[in-house]
Amino acid sequence: MAATTNSFLVGSNNTQIPALKPKSSSQSFLHLSKPNTVNFVSKTKPVAVRCVASTTQVQDGVRSGSVGSQERVFNFAAGPATLPENVLLKAQADLYNWRGSGMSVMEMSHRGKEFLSIIQKAESDLRQLLEIPQEYSVLFLQGGATTQFAALPLNLCKSDDTVDFVVTGSWGDKAVKEAKKYCKTNVIWSGKSEKYTKVPSFEELEQTPDAKYLHICANETIHGVEFKDYPVPKNGFLVADMSSNFCSKPVDVSKFGVIYGGAQKNVGPSGVTIVIIRKDLIGNAQDITPVMLDYKIHDENSSLYNTPPCFGIYMCGLVFEDLLEQGGLKEVEKKNQRKADLLYNAIEESNGFFRCPVEKSVRSLMNVPFTLEKSELEAEFIKEAAKEKMVQLKGHRSVGGMRASIYNAMPLAGVEKLVAFMKDFQAKHA
């Protein structure tokens, strides 16, 4: 029958969506002829659009189907990055009407009971995942880890305090440059001269005796360098940017004064920044600290001082729930180790056709940079991989080559397909 003002389109979760009545016969309108099919009728010709529901499931990291009629790619992007398909499907099912509330999460008041239940559960699940002690606060903020490069010294230092930095890549270097505006900085080790391919021996670090804290980037996304253990500050406390390996493995939170990171690599979409901070470190911000960078303001207001990134926090909550359902971070780490071993072994077994410049002992489980012996073939490698539905393999513009980011949500099947492609490519071009 033709759609009228009393007609409804029925979604895959039986949600009724009112169909609009055209203002005149010259405008396009809708006919519902077959189940799940919408005919767009105009003066020219009808166009039928078939809406296909899918029950795609991912078991043991392997896809059992595709969403709708459009097969998904394997997305190796460094961030924003691939998200778990079951999380996306949950969000899709609730997008129009969240749990019978009559509204989308994107429409909720951040001070309403519905969103309060979302953010409180997200924090609770994250605390369970990382076994966060009660003497730590969890903040859901905005601005990315880059904003925290300023927020950290503003909240934790006086202008004449010194902060030590171990710089193992581009992000650690950026953190130093920003901190210089608000405190004294001392780079006690930098891997820049060796093109950021290693982590130093902690015994050789000459720390500043009265340093307020020691800052590291736990996993350098661009260069693929990851701390497998952490230095112990002689004075002060340890602060870590964990943007690209957050929730990829268990972490002893009590070893840190602050852990922070952007969500868009491992635990959600872009727009959410998570800060885990020891409570006794809150409340000492410099007078010049903007209100939106003051940890005390956000802590006292439970991350609701202003409108937070509501939908992003909701998505993070779904990811935390998913990680718990997988068995927690010990199980997640096992899966990540298996994927990384598969890819690194393929590189090592290529007899130099593929090369990873990073020292083996500190190679990242999350970001795998590699180059070709014949660099002139790299563009073709990226192009041909895209044809096989493996995308975002181009290395960061500052280093070139290729990079495969294999975060939690990258299924084993994606890495297996990439390794098979690498072997075929080598056979054709060796």
Curated annotation (Swiss-Prot):
Its main location: plastid. The keyword Translocase does not apply. One of its GO terms (biological process) is L-serine biosynthetic process. Gene3D superfamilies: Aspartate Aminotransferase, domain 1 (3.90.1150.10), Type I PLP-dependent aspartate aminotransferase-like (Major domain) (3.40.640.10). Keywords: Acetylation, Amino-acid biosynthesis, Aminotransferase, Chloroplast, Plastid, Pyridoxal phosphate, Serine biosynthesis, Transferase, Transit peptide. Coiled coil: none annotated. GO terms for molecular function: O-phospho-L-serine:2-oxoglutarate aminotransferase activity; protein homodimerization activity; pyridoxal phosphate binding. L-glutamate binds at residue 111. Residues 1-51 form a transit peptide. Induction: Up-regulated upon necrotrophic pathogen infection. Its EC number is 2.6.1.52. It comes from the Eukaryota. The modification N-acetylvaline is found at residue 52. Pathway: Amino-acid biosynthesis; L-serine biosynthesis; L-serine from 3-phospho-D-glycerate: step 2/3; Cofactor biosynthesis; pyridoxine 5'-phosphate biosynthesis; pyridoxine 5'-phosphate from D-erythrose 4-phosphate: step 3/5. Belongs to the class-V pyridoxal-phosphate-dependent aminotransferase family. SerC subfamily. Involved in the plastidial phosphorylated pathway of serine biosynthesis (PPSB). Catalyzes the reversible conversion of 3-phosphohydroxypyruvate to phosphoserine. This is Phosphoserine aminotransferase 1, chloroplastic. It comes from Arabidopsis thaliana.
